[in-house]
From Swiss-Prot:
<dbReference type="GO" id="GO:0003684">
    <property type="term" value="F:damaged DNA binding"/>
</dbReference>
<feature type="binding site">
    <location>
        <begin position="602"/>
        <end position="609"/>
    </location>
    <ligand>
        <name>ATP</name>
    </ligand>
</feature>
<dbReference type="Pfam" id="PF01624">
    <property type="entry name" value="MutS_I"/>
</dbReference>
<protein>
    <recommendedName>
        <fullName>DNA mismatch repair protein MutS</fullName>
    </recommendedName>
</protein>
<dbReference type="Pfam" id="PF05192">
    <property type="entry name" value="MutS_III"/>
</dbReference>
<keyword id="KW-0067">ATP-binding</keyword>
<comment type="function">
    <text>This protein is involved in the repair of mismatches in DNA. It is possible that it carries out the mismatch recognition step. This protein has a weak ATPase activity.</text>
</comment>
<dbReference type="InterPro" id="IPR000432">
    <property type="entry name" value="DNA_mismatch_repair_MutS_C"/>
</dbReference>
<keyword id="KW-0547">Nucleotide-binding</keyword>
<dbReference type="InterPro" id="IPR027417">
    <property type="entry name" value="P-loop_NTPase"/>
</dbReference>
<keyword id="KW-0227">DNA damage</keyword>
<dbReference type="Pfam" id="PF05188">
    <property type="entry name" value="MutS_II"/>
</dbReference>
<dbReference type="InterPro" id="IPR045076">
    <property type="entry name" value="MutS"/>
</dbReference>
<dbReference type="InterPro" id="IPR007861">
    <property type="entry name" value="DNA_mismatch_repair_MutS_clamp"/>
</dbReference>
<dbReference type="GO" id="GO:0005829">
    <property type="term" value="C:cytosol"/>
</dbReference>
<dbReference type="Pfam" id="PF05190">
    <property type="entry name" value="MutS_IV"/>
</dbReference>
<dbReference type="InterPro" id="IPR007696">
    <property type="entry name" value="DNA_mismatch_repair_MutS_core"/>
</dbReference>
Amino acid sequence: MSNVTPMMQQYLKIKSEYQDCLLFFRLGDFYEMFYEDAKEASRVLEITLTKRDAKKENPIPMCGVPYHSADSYIDTLVNNGYKVAICEQMEDPKQTKGMVRREVVRIVTPGTVMEQGGVDDKQNNYILSFVMNQPEIALSYCDVSTGELKVTHFNDEATLLNEITTINPNEVVINDNISDHLKRQINMVTETITVRETLSSEIYSVNQTEHKLMYQATQLLLDYIHHTQKRDLSHIEDAVQYAAIDYMKMDFYAKRNLELTESIRLKSKKGTLLWLMDETKTPMGARRLKQWIDRPLISKEQIEARLDIVDEFSAHFIERDTLRTYLNQVYDIERLVGRVSYGNVNARDLIQLKHSISEIPNIKALLNSMNQDTLVQVNQLEPLDDLLDILEQSLVEEPPISVKDGGLFKVGFNMQLDEYLEASKNGKTWLAELQAKERQRTGIKSLKISFNKVFGYFIEITRANLQNFEPSEFGYMRKQTLSNAERFITDELKEKEDIILGAEDKAIELEYQLFVQLREEVKKYTERLQHQAKIISELDCLQSFAEIAQKYNYTRPSFSENKTLELVESRHPVVERVMDYNDYVPNNCRLDNETFIYLITGPNMSGKSTYMRQVAIISIMAQMGAYVPCKEAVLPIFDQIFTRIGAADDLVSGKSTFMVEMLEAQKALTYATEDSLIIFDEIGRGTSTYDGLALAQAMIEYVAETSHAKTLFSTHYHELTTLDQALPSLKNVHVAANEYKGELIFLHKVKDGAVDDSYGIQVAKLADLPEKVISRAQVILSEFEASAGKKSSISNLKMVENEPEINQENSNLSVEETTDTLSQKDFEQASFDLFENDQESEIELQIKNLNLSNMTPIEALVKLSELQNQLK
């Protein structure tokens, strides 16, 4: 340390206190980074890495960014999961002898971003904490930008992971007793996990609760937020307690597979249920909509209350259109209030707040013309006329962005300010007169009087006009020489400059003081403004439901008392939107207490997965309180939805497709109740044919015998279709397809009964696989079918094993061994026959040479008849 300069000693001391952050160290007009921070920041920000003391033996790596444009660089780092500690100069270097005092004034983390450009308007930016005292777990989460703060508790890690998935925080704060295994699972949702080993001694204002663990979780969270932000956060609301069991439960897999808020392929909003339903007009409404999608209701009373309002908006489409116009003028009240409390609000933000609250009386008057018994929110809307008057009387309509450059307040708002502004204005009038006088006196028509912050006011004469010009004759004193001009000052101009700049400086200083006072006055309205924002966001969501209902021809769902699900002409809302409405084929679905399992067969690409997804999505929409894409819809209220759809390796945790499949199935089989909905799409395809078939059948039987959950189960194991003989609760349905002139035509219509062909080769043909591959596949398929003989389901194999005539060779085998032995022998024989070298008959040669992929069904029957006649 002896060779390190005092300034670098100061840097190293501060850095030692913020080891987990990149330190932005203020030096003049730049934020500098050194050592490993500089290497890391230069790589992520793609800026030049230089060296301090480059001529010394061990130069220090460094990089920097201008302070006036630092926000964009900070946003980039935070979006990449870094924390940034902002270290400012706490003294004016011009007025300080020796080292300037520096302090970290704020730590920007992924979960505490407050700047307008650093957060998505339509997304919450949550930070979450939890504490454990087995078996109890308490969880608290907050959006610092809006002030929302909630807390809950439960008794199992599965609910913890579900809640973290639902909340989708950008940062998680934990104490140091959390297992590494649990940390890895949390890392699947968020990259930023902060371990907070000890709490500060300060106790923050939290609603008192009898539940000690919830109090601790909230304290842990607020302590961390105050530690990083280091300023007033009075806009953070009192913690609101909620219970996870008050909402439909969907785990990470269900939300991903159903593409509720993020598409699987594009990882974006487009193509999701959120994308379809978002006809909101305010950022608050858009965030509320996402919350409602993530947490469908399970209270019939609450659902019906929302539906009643959607009814009202649907019936009054003219009023709804007017409401949308009013809402379009409302800015993000929640985040504007947050910035007021936080201290980074500017005058333009307050003008946005003024425009927003000026629409509240319009909205209230409009809703008063509708059914007030239904629209309970109308009584909670509060025109904030007193705040509106304050903002109207104080700020100009188009103030500058900076609050330290003046020009914020209207004339007449403050007498002292008016005097300063008048003096400045008169001075500038005098300057204009002086410029005209000097042009006449010198005869130089291009002479001008200008100003900059470095040199103040000056007279500028271009070099072309300086020939034969003697400055001293006119009392001009040279102030600055440029390549194409000279700048001068006179005693008279200097005297007036002091008066003008003195008035301007005093005006700017006074305006800033007045703005701080105005900000503190607005802060008093925080709670009332937050309540109005909540009401407006709910109205925005509900008018959005009515808008999409009218636009896409949706209907109001009803809820059955006997747990029946009956959808008439149902459609997948997202698929329907990206297609032509008239091209979409609607389908029915009926599940009740007697028949609660659909076994769905049909070709690949026929629409089995879409059909199952649409049942789940319609259920979610209904429990959000929205209309649904059906002609008629009667639904039970589901407590949970489980899905197993599509193939997805989990590379991060090293799980194979089949392992992921089994984990998703395990959750459904373990936690589903008779009030749950299960979507199983082709279970078992990630393993061998017979393992997969056995597992699929066992799962169907388990659901039928235990949970009785409503279940949609698609499969290509056609052996399973015989299960309806043993399971009265199971019904076979299929997605229809036809062959016409050798081409496969998907009808996308779900019909009763099973099909025994998946048309895999025809689908491959549609995908334009090489003709040689298609032809060879046809031959191999024919050989398999000929050698395999009569197909048997596993249930049939069980029955064979119980027959007294069973082959003695297998008499001592278990059911599983018998099944495996029979199946493997059949399979091996089928494979072996493909390579037999016995002399082929003429008929076999004819069959072998047939180009089946290019034959129509009629042509194939004619050829078959010819071959049959040859054998007679």
